[in-house]
From Swiss-Prot:
Catalyzes the phosphorylation of the position 2 hydroxy group of 4-diphosphocytidyl-2C-methyl-D-erythritol. Belongs to the GHMP kinase family. IspE subfamily. Keywords: ATP-binding, Isoprene biosynthesis, Kinase, Nucleotide-binding, Transferase. It catalyses: 4-CDP-2-C-methyl-D-erythritol + ATP = 4-CDP-2-C-methyl-D-erythritol 2-phosphate + ADP + H(+). The active site is at K11, D142. Its EC number is 2.7.1.148. GO terms for biological process: isopentenyl diphosphate biosynthetic process, methylerythritol 4-phosphate pathway; terpenoid biosynthetic process. One of its GO terms (molecular function) is 4-(cytidine 5'-diphospho)-2-C-methyl-D-erythritol kinase activity. It holds the Pfam family GHMP_kinases_N. This is 4-diphosphocytidyl-2-C-methyl-D-erythritol kinase. It is an enzyme of class 2 (transferase).
Length: 316
């Protein structure tokens, strides 16, 4: 039966600032989000059973409706029930999991985005990227970004996207302790408890701050593709609560700096940390140096690069 194979990239945050509390209970955010060259692969295949069947060999990936990929299929089947009924059958979703789980890299969100793109193609729905991103926002704050990828300034909950010039090819080293997981709700709730008194209190103040960030140093550095300046402007509010709670993450960050990373930061709610490098050779050397110094079997390291594409699909 017909199938599509999709590549679904991880993301890092080059910037994350929490502005305040929204009426819907979420935080108002300003982020610069960036896809990287570390991918999950997802096969979306029509079946005759009428069911959603989710397959993945990774022991930490749930095969139930708690998985965003599963919920993405449910959403498409519900929203396009007439087309689903005409097509007949269900869908088999097979995930090859290469992106670390619970790592602040949008691994679950990008899989959900891939299922949306795959079913759009499989059922010949003809949805545009903005239409897919509107659906994606119902699944999670990072999912709309994962559809298109690239370099983007994201506001609201993260679903309002404004493209920036691509930064293709900048080498990075990515690192995560496999024995550390950070709960995203915990990170944001702890930040609120510790720093909520400093939140901006109204939408007008949020807009003013967003304008300042749009005109600020990081955006200018991205427009100029100035790696040194980008590294200088990296910022993540959630480091204020995660690093004190997880000293190994702080140690990892410090180790990257010690061995010459141009810039280093935790991505999202962590615990993944990335380091920007000038050249691939520097990135490869940095990976070896950090692995040797920390000498921890639970520490996983990857050499990869900044990459612009979001979800990519091939017919099988």
């Amino acid at each position: 039966m017909s199938a599509y194979l999709l590549t679904a990239p991880a993301k890092i945050n080059l910037y994350l600032e929490i502005l305040g509390d929204r009426p819907d209970g979420f935080h108002e955010l300003v982020m610069v989000m960036q896809t990287i060259g570390l991918y999950d692969r997802i096969e979306v295949r029509q079946n005759r059973s009428g069911d959603i069947n989710l397959y993945c060999q990774h022991p930490e990936v749930p095969l139930t409706a708690s998985n965003i990929a599963y919920r993405a299929a449910q959403l498409m089947m519900t929203r396009f029930a007439d087309i689903y009924a005409r097509v007949g059958g269900g869908v088999d979703i097979t995930i090859e999991k290469n992106i670390p789980v619970a790592a602040g890299l949008a691994g679950g969100s990008t899989d959900g985005a891939a299922v949306l793109v795959g079913l759009n193609l499989l059922w010949d729905l003809g949805l545009t990227q903005p239409e897919l991103q509107t659906l994606a926002a119902e699944l999670g704050s990072d999912v709309p970004f994962c559809i298109g990828g690239g370099t983007v300034i994201a506001t609201g909950r993260g679903e309002i996207l404004d493209p920036l010039p691509d930064l293709d090819g900048i080498p990075i080293v990515l690192a995560k302790y496999s024995n550390i997981a950070v709960s995203t709700p915990w990170a944001y709730q702890t930040y609120r408890a510790q720093f909520g008194e400093h939140y901006l209190q109204d939408a007008a103040s949020w807009r003013t701050r967003m304008t300042q960030i749009h005109a600020g140093g990081l955006i200018k550095a991205i427009q100029q593709k100035n790696i040194q300046a980008i590294a200088h402007e990296l910022h993540n509010d959630l480091e204020k609560v995660v690093l004190p709670e997880f000293p190994q993450v702080q140690q990892l960050r410090d180790c990257f700096t010690k061995h010459g990373a141009i810039g280093t930061m935790m991505s999202g709610s962590g615990p993944s940390v990335f380091a920007l490098c000038e050249t691939l050779a520097q990135a490869q050397a940095l990976k070896v140096q950090v692995a040797q110094e920390l000498n921890d079997p639970a520490l996983d390291l990857w050499v990869t690069h900044i990459a612009s594409p979001g979800i990519q699909a091939d017919f099988r």
